[in-house]
Swiss-Prot record:
It is found in: Cell membrane. HAMAP family: MscL. This is Large-conductance mechanosensitive channel. PROSITE patterns: MSCL. Homopentamer. The extracellular loop between the two transmembrane domains modulates channel kinetics, and in particular the length of time the channel remains in the open conformation. Channel that opens in response to stretch forces in the membrane lipid bilayer. Forms a nonselective ion channel with a conductance of about 2.5-4 nanosiemens. May participate in the regulation of osmotic pressure changes within the cell. GO terms for biological process: monoatomic ion transport.
């Protein structure tokens, strides 16, 4: 049973997922800080208060906090979208380079095979 768990835990997909979760949590903190400390104060200045999230409420319903959470989500989702798009672009370039190397090797082997056939 320990061997099976070790095989499961050390599979590439599980390790990739664990790394992605940790990096996602760290990335979330960065983006949340960006939204909370830079973007929301700028938006607050536009609407006439420093932090509208705490001040915008009606009968105890703090819809300003909800609006801030929605903006936070949109910015985090967009940042992750850009990050994934860049990562996919880099991965495609690496795959294309690997395919080119394989094709070059195949061409050389084909030429060697043809030369050996001619000598016979």
């Amino acid at each position: 049973m320990l061997k099976e768990f070790k095989e499961f835990a050390l599979k590439g997909n599980v390790l990739d997922l664990a790394i992605a979760v940790v990096m996602g949590a760290a990335f979330n903190k960065i983006i949340s800080s960006l939204v909370e400390n830079i973007i929301m104060p700028l938006i607050g200045k536009i609407f006439g208060s420093v932090d509208f999230a705490k001040e915008w409420s009606f009968w105890g319903i703090k819809y300003g906090l909800f609006i801030q959470s929605v903006i936070d989500f949109i910015i985090i989702a967009f940042a992750l979208f850009i990050f994934v798009k860049i990562a996919n672009t880099l991965m495609k370039k690496e795959e294309a380079e690997e395919e080119a190397v394989v094709e070059e090797n195949v061409v050389l082997l084909t030429e060697i095979r043809d030369l050996l056939r001619e000598k016979k």
